[in-house]
Each structure stands twice: as C-alpha cells, then as structure tokens.
Amino acid sequence: MSKGRIILLVIAALLVLLVLSARTLAGFYVDLLWFDSVNRGDTFWAVLKSKIFLGAVFSVGFAVVSFISLTLAERLAPADLPEGPEREVVQRYRMFVGKRTRILRLAISIVFGLIVGVPAIAQWQDWLLFRHSKSFGVSDPQFGVDAGFYVFRLPFLTFVVDWAFAALVLVILMTAAMHFLNGAVRVQMPGQRITKSGRVHMSILFSMLAVIKAADYWLQRFELTVSSRGVVQGATYTDVKAQLPALNLLILISLLVAVLFIAGIRWGGWRLPLLSMALWAVVAVVAGAVYPAVIQRFVVQPNVTTRERDYIARNVEATQRAMGLDNVQVVNLTAEEATAADVKASVVPLSDTRLLDVTEMKDRFALDQGQFAFYSINDLDVDRYDVDGRVQQTMVAARELNPDGIPNKTWVSKHLIYTHGCGVVAASASRVTSDGRPIYEDGIDARPQLYVGTEQPGYAIVNTNQVEQACPNTEAEPYAGVAGVKLNSTVRRLAYALTLGEFNLFGSSLITDESRLIDVRDVRDRVSKVAPFLHLDADPYPVVSEGKVLWVIDAFTTTSRYPYAQQANTDNLSASSGLNHTFNYVRNSVKAVVDAYDGTVTLYVVDATDPIVLAWSSAFPGLFTPADQIPDSLRAHFRYPEDLFRVQTNLYGRYQFSDVDQFFNRDAAWSVAQAAPREPELSTGAGDATTVVDETAQANTGDVADANVARFEPYYTMFHSPEGDVDTGTFSLVRPFVPFSSDDTRKELRALMVVSSEPATYGQLKVYVYDGTLPAGPATVAAELSSNPTISPVVTLLDQRGSRVIFGQLQLVPVGKGLVWVRPLYVRPDDSGSKQVFVRRVLAWHDGEAVIGETLTEAINRLFPGANIDLGETVDTGIQDPGTTDPGTTDPGTTDPGTTDPGTTDPGSGVTDPAVLLEEAQSLFDEADAALRDGDLGAYQDKVSEAQDLIAQALVLLGA
C-alpha cells in the first residue's frame, strides 16, 4: 500500500470520527458557552481540571504499574521450554508476537488503564473536599480525631485504597497470564509449576496486596464511628469491645502475611504464606463477624442500658451538634383559660391568623390571575410584606409560562413568541372578600417578564426579528438582560443546532447576531448546574426586591459521615426534596438567588461557620458571595426551610435529652403531633384514619420514626410569643409535639417548637413546653371541631349537592395564657377540574368549646362572649365572580345565625325539631331533582327555595 493511500485512509478515518463525535464536541462547547454566560467559566474549568487530573492519575498509575509488571514477566521468561502440554501454546504466542511484545504490553496497559482509571473522575467532589478540607473544631470521643477527617479525608482515602486493591488484583491476573504465555507457569507439569523468578515476582505482588488490605482494615476502624449495629449510631459497645480489636488483629495478620510472602522468596516457597492466608480467612470470619455478633447477642442485649450508656451519651451530643439542635431555647408555660379581656388585648395575633391555604388556594389564584392559557400558577408560597403599614403574611405566586397552553405550537411560537411568564401575584393571607375570595394586592412594582422559573422546560430565543408576546398591560420591548448566549456566529448556531437537534437554530432568518438563546430555565436546574454539590430545597419561592423578581432556593450541605451522629428520619419528605437522602449532618448554609429576568445566579453564604461550605468556597474561589452583601430588602424575605425544620423536629422529640435513662426509656419523650385530617369524613377519628407513613419505633432503638399515622405539618405564621410583646409577631415556622406513646394514643399538646425567619433572629429555635395539666393537641381539637353538634350539621350540608368541604390549616394562636385553635373551612365544587375555592366558614376552639362563624371575627366573638372585637379580616369589595357559580352562596349557613334567637322559629313552619326540618328539606331536594329531570325548571327552583328555607330554620334551632 502506497504512502499516499495510507494518508487518505487516515484522513477518511479522522473525518468519520469527527462526524460521529460532532454532537459530543458541540455539547462541550455549548456547556462552556452557558457557564460563560452566567460568569461561571472558572467553575466549569475547575471541575473539568479535577476530572482530567483524577482520570489521568489513576489511568496512568494503573498503566505504569501494569506495564512494569508485564515487562518483568516478559524478561523473567525462561529461555528453555521443557516438554509439556503448555510448550506449544508458548511457542505459538512467541511466533505471533515476535518483536512486537513491547508494543503489545504498552497497548494492554493503556487500554486497561483507561478502563480502570477513567471511572475515577466520578470522585471529583470527594477529591476537592480532600484537598480543601477544613477543621470542625470537634474531635470524636473514640479516636480523638477531628470530625473534618471523617467528612473530608476518609471518603477519598477509602476510595483510593479500595481502587488500589481492585487494581492490584487485576494486575496480578494480567501478570499471571503473561507468565503462563511466556512459559514461567506450567499448570499441567508435575513438580514445580512456576519458575523461581516467576514465584519471586508473584510473591512481591501478593505481599503488596496484603499491605493494601491492612490499610483497608485501618480505615475501617474509623468507619465504626457511623456504625448502625448498636442501639444508636456510632461506635457502640460491640464495635469498641469486639469489632475494633478484631480489626486491629486483622491488620497485624495481613502485615504478617505480607512479610511471609517476602520471606518465602528465600525460605520455604509459598507454603507458609498460603497457610497464613488460610488463617487470615478464618480470623476474618470468626473475629470479624462471629465474635461481634456473639457479644452483641449475649453481652449487650441482656443489659443494654449499662453496656451502651457511654455510647448513647456520645450519640446524643453528636446528633444535637450535627443537626443544629445544640442551642435550643426552652420556655416553660402553663396553659390557662383565656378571657374576653385577653382577646381584646390579642387583636393583632388573631388578625394575623392565615385564612388562605397554600394547597387549596393555588387553584383559586390560577382562576383569578392566570389571565391566559399560556400562563399558569405552579405554586403558592407564604411570605410577608408590608400591607397597610404593617408586616403581614402574604400569599405570593409567580405567573409562569405554561408551554401546554401555547396556541399554534410551531417552533416560532414555542421558542420566539411565548418566551416568558408575566409578573407576581400577591394576596393578603389573613383577609378575604365577603364572598370568601382572596384580596389581591396592588402596587408590587417589579419588572414582569419571567424568563426562568420553577417549571420552564426547553429554551427561549430573545431579540429576534419576531416580536415576543408582551405581558398584559405592557408593550413588547426588546430583551435588555444578560441571560443566555449570543448567537452571533455560525459556529455557535451550528453547535446549538447539533446539541438541541433543531435545524431552525442554524437556518432561521428570524435569528440575528443580537439574538440570545436562554436555556436551563428551571431555577433548580440552573443552580444545580453551577453548584452540583449543593442539595436544593424542593420549594423555590419568588421575592420582589428592588424592582426585580428573584427566585430564592434554600441550599443545604450534608454528610453521612459525622462521627456518632444519628441519621435523619426523612420518611415524610417529598421525593424532590434536597434532603431526601441519607445524612447525619446538615446545614442550610447557602441561599441561592436567581434573577427571574436575566437568570443571574448568586449563592449567598448565610452560615459561615459550616466547614463544608467553607471547603467548597476554597475549592471554587468567587463562586460564593458573603452574607454581608445580601440586600436588606432581600434578606427580609428569607424563610427558614420547611424540610430542615421537619428533620429537626422529627429528631428533637427524643434528642432533647442529655440524660441517658430518659433518652433510652423514652418516659418523657415527645412525638410530632398527629395530623389533623383535611376531609370531613376523616376528621371525627382524631387522626386515626390518616395515611400510614412510618413504622412504629421501638423504645430501645435509636430510630426516631415515632408513630404509624401522618404527622402534623409545620406551617409558616406570624407567631406572637406568649412571653413577649403581644403586638409584635415574628415570621416563623411552628410544629407541635405530643407525649410519646408507641401506640400513638397520647394526643395532648406537650410543646411547640418555633423557629424564626426574621433577619435579626433567623434560625433561632425555641421550644415552648407546657407543664401541669396538658391542653388538647391538634388531633383532639380537630375531632372536637368536626363532631361538635352545632358544627357538624353545617359541614354536612355544605359537603353535598355538588360541593365539597375541605378543612384548612389548623393554627394555634396564644391568647393571654390560653390557646386558641383556628381553622378555616373551604368549599369548592365536587369537580376535579374546577378551580373555584371559597373561604366559607371559620372554626375556632378554646378549652373544650368549639364554635363556627362566617368570619373569624364572628367565631372569636362567639367563643368569647363580651369580647366584641373586629379583626377586619373580611372586606366587602362588591365584586362577584362573573359567569361563575359560587358553591356556597346559597347554602343554609349564609344566614347569620347570631341575629335570631335560637329558641324561636319561623311562625309559618310550626316545627321546632331541626331533624324534622332537615328531613323535609331532603325530601324537597329529591323532588327538585325529579322536576329537573322532567324539564320543569320552575318547579325545580320552587322546591330548592323551600328546602333552603327549611335548612335555615334548622340552623337557627341548632344555634349555628
């Protein structure tokens, strides 16, 4: 073959390779452009360099070791081949290889080096933490080593040792095969089956393998600090008294085996090393597995408290520190009966009660404020804003782009016209219209275009020759932000066309040199791409700050290697939660903020004491922004994350105790209170019919899953401390506790945990503990509200005829030294597609008495006769929903039952038994249905009106 022909073939092969790899290369280039567009090109290169370094070191390391070993095997080949079955195999190998043995060895070493070494790039995060490790300032009580060793160094060291062991096993197999092909190993020959030189070579390799295993045993000692063998996690009695000595013994034996392999080179061959390896295996089974199991069963379990006492104390202290529970303020209170005078003094706390529910009102917001099908309300969040001169709870939602609602779904429509959402919707959480709808706030001044959001798939191209869809009440204008990548070159457009598989990106005349392609538009994906080592909260929320709409995402740093700390119970977290994984240390160290208009990602460090975030800051200089640069207008809207609070409260019920006996026996332990069911048919059982979420915890384990029913979810509120200024509320998360019981029968309120989101006291955990006679807990209150003879008929009547009743969040309001529980009641059509939701009633409970009112003011005044307060939570706007049917406006409860003496009735009825009236009303409704089926609309209306009159009379008799 001529030289020119060879060159042509090489060029052709390179062209084919280039075509096949074009999309990969384009993807790499597009990634680089994206990182540059968010000013994080340094992060891109830092991660890439770390991956290249690891892949190169481990690949080259394996290739060098294997090449040296294979070269030695080649040079130690016997010159003369004795007669035998293997002779022909060796001769054929030598004839085939000829003078190309060096090239063959090099090729084998490189190929296997890449196979074994390239996967090491997955360890880039552990490697960076290893390089930039920090001190926790706390040493573990067993080995006296700083916790930073376990978090930052041990993971990577363990990987290196495990990799080295597996790599050396592969080298040994490759070397043995080379010795066989060279004639040094003669499997079927009698007598000596390996040459002396081959035996020396293999002995050295086996000795190295034993040394690596000794290093593995040494590292396993430190892994005991997160052992789960005992009653709690960490190195407990069996680990310290049995497993640790066994590992120390195995270290000595493995080193002895290494020495014997070297000694066997000169004396005695392999017999002694092989015998020692057999002994090693026996000791590994007996001392490493059987003996600890025997100690655990026959020494520890019969006397757990005595044996594990010191180790439980270690676990409690470490868990409190690792989970941020080591600085909880405790306030002891005694619940007393509140008075009308207390109510008059508590107008502000009561008026801060939230009437709107984030779950139920999302549909209402979408119906009222969605405006067009191509916009959607994906989530509703609780925040606080200045309303009428006072900071109040506010429901906030972003009006985001809905790709499914885009008309005429062409490429131009999806990517050039409908490119963004429009604005933020807000309503007071504590006020509603007279017909039970939200009161939307005006005057939120912010640029409305939202190019990134919570559910924004695909990409958008701005500044094209196609005008974008303008936000309502605004005119279309060119994009003025910095988000996205400029498509100002043929190379860029071709790269995006290849990566996204869309030819229009390359060929469309609508795209100009000023056009920008904005992709990765989901805010969580955007932050994850910049900082993949952070665990992100599942609930980003919009904040209006300095004329901008900003998305705030709580970001966590976690590890599962904090010595002696208990793993978090994450059973009740959502699948998308950033904390839905195994960990025993957590900090909400970072607030990620994304500009909804220009996509800028800013990572604010809000906990500079966290060694993990400090390590990442060292690894990526410039990636994080210090807390002192957070604008005050933004900081005022930071919220303590719900999922972190869930984890902490799940643990605190037991980990509040430092006393080992109290911790172990759980005599005074707490559980998170049982949930209050939302559906009327589930409410009378006080939570017994709720969904099973956990297994009942055993009293003698470290498990913190306390019960087999759903738990009370934490909620945001303007909390007014019973010990402080009653008119000063702090935006907080609240979650109640009940006394622990393995069968979940205890439902009294034992304590409240409250965590502040206010800038001055952010993250401060406070527990209000109730002593003496315990007040009723939320499950009991919910049951009494639902089964009350005055309330139950109203709920029953509202929950029929095409309507469905849903209970809102059960909220606790301290009034004086007493506790008032408040719960809004919603009515919506019994149609899964309907979005109409109305606040129809408010339930209130105090000291065993339950009432219902059309408004919160009415309910409180009934609960406390003589209070005569006006909370101002209902505003008559005079606006009704056009073209909609209110599923509660014609219900019997709209008549104010407080204006009629309950001992009187309509003179025309002559009936004083409400049960009879309700039966007659039911009969009239049946007759109305029959008339409707016959097409007699006049008779239908008459029957319905008569039935409603009877129901109103029944309610008067019931005092409702």
For the regions a language model picked out, list residue spans one by one.
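Soluble extracytoplasmic regions of secretory-pathway and membrane proteins
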Residues: 4, 11-934, 938-958
